[in-house]
Design a protein with these regions (language model features):
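N-terminal glycine-rich phosphate/pyrophosphate-binding loop and immediately adjacent elements
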Residues: 2-143
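A conserved short coil-to-beta-strand element within the FAD-binding core of flavoproteins
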Residues: 249-264
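Extended, hydrophobic alpha-helical segments in both membrane/secreted and soluble proteins
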Residues: 11-16, 232-236, 240, 249-253, ...
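Core beta-strand elements of the Rossmann-like FAD/NAD(P) dinucleotide-binding domain
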Residues: 2, 268-278, 282
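Active-site/ligand-binding neighborhood in enzyme catalytic cores
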Residues: 136-243, 250
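A structural preference for short, hydrophobic beta-strand core positions in alpha/beta folds
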Residues: 29, 247-249
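Short glycine-/small-residue-rich Rossmann-like dinucleotide-binding loops
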Residues: 54, 284-285
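Well-ordered beta-strand scaffold positions
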Residues: 48, 95, 252, 271-272
């Protein structure tokens, strides 16, 4: 079997290792930390999980493309996801809503969000419904498109259907020009105006950055994996080792040894050399 040495047991390194093992390669991963995950990590502090990475994972519903992608490696039916009712709460500084609250709730459910905003500002109905529609339009397109291998004729038919994504490019081009500041200016309600100005801590950001996650939150396609980021990474590491892969923890790589313009081995701690046919670097730095 061809031997591949992988640098880094983060999500990319672990997933690459899984696919290589499934396709007949012999692999081993070298990780300088003593746990898997890389930047996909979390800590337990008493009853709390401190998680600075995966606030949500795309693919928590069975109908999405990401669900099918993750399912090639993990059994998602055995993983519990939590779907939050409220995405974020924005504390408005200078105004209040008609109930006297200075908190603007961004609900994950689009119907709930629309009704909430219409209740706060009926006079902004046109702007609110256009805002919600911009998010709903994105839901009409599967991202990424499912591209399973098909026979010739069905493949041609699918290719013709994929032409509808040309319209999607036009939608993206339109939405990428509108920022939260631009949208805020359209509201008559001082409360909604200020809330959208503060959508990204007062920074001006394109609404496309907001709309994409909102579209998947509404469909419950982006849930939080119970257990946190480290538990998620550990599941992938367990899958990798079950496929026959090896992980060397606490083993920083000192050098990639090359010969005739090709990678031939890794020099790791204690000056141990691990020979291979190729090296795949999945380290950020």
């Amino acid at each position: 079997k061809p031997k591949i040495n992988i640098i880094g047991a983060g999500i990319s390194g672990l997933c690459a290792g899984c696919y290589l093992q499934m396709n007949g390669f012999e692999t081993q991963i070298f990780e300088k930390h003593d746990i898997p995950g890389g930047l996909c990590t979390s800590w337990e502090k008493g009853e709390y999980t401190i998680d600075g990475c995966a606030h949500w994972i795309l693919g928590s519903d069975k109908g999405s493309g990401f669900y099918h992608m993750w399912s090639e490696i993990l059994n998602l039916e055995k993983i519990n996801f939590h779907h939050h009712e409220i995405r974020i709460q924005i504390k408005v500084k200078n105004t209040a809503d008609k109930y006297g609250s200075k908190i603007f709730n961004v609900y994950n459910d689009l119907n709930t969000l629309q009704n909430y905003m219409l209740d706060l500002s009926p006079e902004d109905e046109v702007v609110i419904k256009q805002f919600i529609n911009d998010v709903r339009v994105l839901q009409k397109y599967e991202l990424p498109p499912l591209m399973d291998k098909l026979p010739l004729i069905p493949s041609i038919i699918r290719g013709i259907k994929m032409m509808r994504y040309l319209k999607f490019l036009l939608i993206l081009n339109k939405q990428r020009k509108v920022s939260n500041y631009d949208l805020a200016k359209k509201f008559k309600s001082p409360f909604l105006k200020e809330a959208f100005e503060l959508l990204y801590d007062g920074q001006e950001v394109k609404m496309l950055v907001f709309n994409f996650p909102q579209a998947v939150f509404d469909k419950k396609s982006a849930g939080y994996p119970i257990g946190g980021s480290l538990a998620w990474a550990q599941k992938i590491a367990d899958k990798y080792t079950s496929l026959g892969g090896k992980i060397h923890y606490s083993t920083p790589v000192k050098k990639i040894i090359t010969e005739n313009n090709g990678a031939k081995a890794l020099l790791v701690r204690n000056d141990v050399i691990h020979e291979c046919d190729a090296v795949l670097s999945a380290a950020d730095w």
